[in-house]
């Protein structure tokens, strides 16, 4: 676990992807409920 540094790339990726999915799903949910 000393030379294997995949978490250093994985942590920001997950940190960016998770909020993006959350915001996208929330946005789609609002768009589906409010048909303007």
Swiss-Prot record:
Subcellular location: Plastid, Chloroplast thylakoid membrane
Membrane spanning stretches: 8-28
Pfam families, per database record: PSI_8
InterPro entries named in the record: PSI_PsaI, PSI_PsaI_sf
Lipid bilayer topology: Single-pass membrane protein
Keyword terms: Chloroplast, Membrane, Photosynthesis, Photosystem I, Plastid, Thylakoid, Transmembrane, Transmembrane helix
GO biological process terms on file: photosynthesis
Keyword DNA damage attached: no
Any GO CC annotation of this UniProt entry: chloroplast thylakoid membrane
HAMAP family: PSI_PsaI
Function: May help in the organization of the PsaL subunit.
Family: Belongs to the PsaI family.
Name this protein carries in UniProt: Photosystem I reaction center subunit VIII
